């Protein structure tokens, strides 16, 4: 254990002026290196978490938390499925849907996901009505064959509200000239913008009854669910499938977008590993400064040994002194990281206004600010990692100090 004498001497060495000013400089560089590494790591991981949260929130504005769909055939009794889902207190809303891959033709062609909805039930599972820039969800009336397009999709197709688009579905039909894809001309009645390119450029929405007629389908693809807690999506969907007592397929938002979330998680992990090298550099500087301090304090060590301080006691002195440098650097970095994260948006705006530049163009990143989401577990892990690195960095110099023989050290004094 660290006895009071070791702590007292370690604190004295931390505050005392060195005969060699370079040692003081290296010690200060160690503190700054550790503090900088911790600050940058906390801020970067907060930004990465913020981007993950922003993407997830924008994606789930239009995507269901969970889906239950029929296996190999349409779901016919969807009214019963919706009613049964709403009896679960974990479910906030449920609505039927039809989905099919389609090719949309305007001035140009673009593949997209075609989704058939019930307009007066869609607000239970998505915010489509709030994301419409032009038009209304009420324009999707049965038999009128109107269509809502993502803003980017409409721009690519070269169409606007009032224009027509031809929809070719993946299902085929037999005609006198052979097998042809099912097609229908729809009128663009609205444009929506979620702020997520995969949706704004890859989704088209029509009335469910219109889509049933085009596809010659008397049922639906399945039921979409919105939950009070999206983390329970899989359990809720699975329970509903069991209660429906049929061959149903269950999916949730984590499985539908597994590649996206795994890549975001990997990016955060890799970024954390790379930036932790800054802390490692600070710890390496700590080793250098401690080794030079041991050399500078050889006479003091010899006197302490002569007065009865054991080699283990000498080792503890320098471990305390080095660990305190690590603690100061780590705590400074944590404070700096928290303050920087909280004020990052203001700093970004200040830089943009000062230099008259746009760091995050909205047309490229679909955001005007820098989202941050500081996670307490991330801060704890970074803090512990910095403290452990600092402690490990003190071991070798302290061990060297403990090996110094008093007679050898005092011979040249």
UniProtKB/Swiss-Prot annotation:
It is a multi-pass membrane protein. Its main location: membrane. Keywords: Cell inner membrane, Cell membrane, Membrane, Transmembrane, Transmembrane helix, Transport. GO terms for biological process: lipoprotein localization to outer membrane; lipoprotein transport. The keyword Transmembrane applies. It is found in: Cell inner membrane. The chain crosses the membrane at residues 22-42, 269-289, 322-342, 379-399. GO terms for cellular component: plasma membrane protein complex. It comes from the Bacteria. The keyword Cell membrane applies. Pfam families: FtsX, MacB_PCD. InterPro entries: ABC3_permease_C, Lipoprotein-release_system, LolCE_TM, MacB_PCD. Part of an ATP-dependent transport system responsible for the release of lipoproteins targeted to the outer membrane from the inner membrane. Such a release is dependent of the sorting-signal (absence of an Asp at position 2 of the mature lipoprotein) and of LolA. Belongs to the ABC-4 integral membrane protein family. LolC/E subfamily. This is Lipoprotein-releasing system transmembrane protein LolC.
